[in-house]
Every structure is written in C-alpha cells, then in structure tokens.
From Swiss-Prot:
Protein name as catalogued: Cofilin
Domain ADF-H residue range list: 5-137
Family the entry assigns: Belongs to the actin-binding proteins ADF family.
Functional summary from the UniProt entry: Controls reversibly actin polymerization and depolymerization in a pH-sensitive manner. It has the ability to bind G- and F-actin in a 1:1 ratio of cofilin to actin. Binding to F-actin is regulated by tropomyosin. It is the major component of intranuclear and cytoplasmic actin rods. Required for accumulation of actin at the cell division site via depolymerizing actin at the cell ends. In association with myosin II has a role in the assembly of the contractile ring via severing actin filaments. Involved in the maintenance of the contractile ring once formed.
Stored SUPFAM superfamilies: Actin depolymerizing proteins
GO CC field: actin cytoskeleton; cytoplasm; nuclear matrix
Subcellular localization: Cytoplasm; Cytoplasm, Cytoskeleton; Nucleus matrix
Tagged with keyword Amino-acid biosynthesis: no
Alphabetical keyword list: Actin-binding, Cell cycle, Cell division, Cytoplasm, Cytoskeleton, Nucleus
Entry-linked InterPro entries: ADF-H (IPR002108), ADF-H/Gelsolin-like_dom_sf (IPR029006), ADF/Cofilin (IPR017904)
Length: 143
C-alpha cells in the first residue's frame, strides 16, 4: 500500500513476472483504476518497436510502464536486456493526476523486483530511445 492508500493489483505483479521470467511481453502499461484505489494493467504488448511503446504514452495523462529494454553493447559484445520502470507524468496532465501518481509510485516500484533503471518522463525527449539508452548503459556500467 502506498502513501496515497493505493494498492497494487495481483494482475499487475503477474504481468510483470510474465515479462521478466517468461519474456511474454515487451512492455506493460499500468494505470490507476477509476476509483484511484488500485494500480492495474492498462495494456500489455509483445511489440518490439520502441516507437510503438512511446505512441502508447498519453499526451495529457499519467501512467506507469515497464519496458524490457534491449540494446547492443559496443565492440561486438552482443546484446543486453534491462527492465526499465517509467513514471510518465507529462506537464499537461491534470495536477490531481500527477499528485496521485507521484504518491502511489513507490507501492508499484517496490513490488517489481528486477527493475534495473527508473526513468521519470515529463515530455517525450526524456523517454526517447537515446536518453533511456544512456541511462540504462550507465547504470549497467558499460560506459
């Protein structure tokens, strides 16, 4: 339970485990239910294209997301995969929504074991592939 009193739905954890362990999904979008009492799965996808993921982020509302971020290492060292947690809170979102999402984030984030990086996005430049790659690779110590 978070500071805001919001709980994490079991389906949210199950979907995350399917992404992490079963590689069933490439990304998961999480949202608060209509009564703002529980964090639920809004959408799951096996779509590999990062731009398709970005297209799912609403311009005027908040959400959380988990993305199985794959990237190439330099010097032909192969690919790496890191699970990234996104808090999407655009400047144009309603203030109340931003407040509830900010105060509920920790409940979800603590429940998701195995996340390697956290990205806070208020506009699309902060969640662009290159921006995320820089943060993920820095966290992995490959730069």
């Amino acid at each position: 339970m978070s500071r805001s009193g919001v709980a994490v739905a079991d389906e949210s954890l199950n979907a995350f485990n399917d992404l992490k362990l079963g590689k069933k999904y490439k990304f998961i979008l999480y949202a608060l239910n209509d009564s703002k009492t529980e964090i639920i799965v809004k959408e799951t996808s096996a779509e590999q294209d990062y731009d398709k993921f970005l297209e799912q982020l609403p311009e005027n509302d908040c959400l959380y997301a988990v993305y199985d971020f794959e990237y190439e290492l330099g010097n032909n060292e192969g690919k790496r995969s890191k699970i990234v947690f996104f808090t999407w809170s655009p400047d144009t979102a309603p203030v109340r929504s931003k407040m509830v999402y900010a105060s509920s984030k920790d409940a979800l984030r603590r429940a998701l074991n195995g996340v390697s990086s956290d990205i806070q996005g208020t506009d699309f430049s902060e969640v662009a592939y290159e921006s995320v790659l820089e943060k993920v690779s820095r966290a992995a110590g490959s730069h």
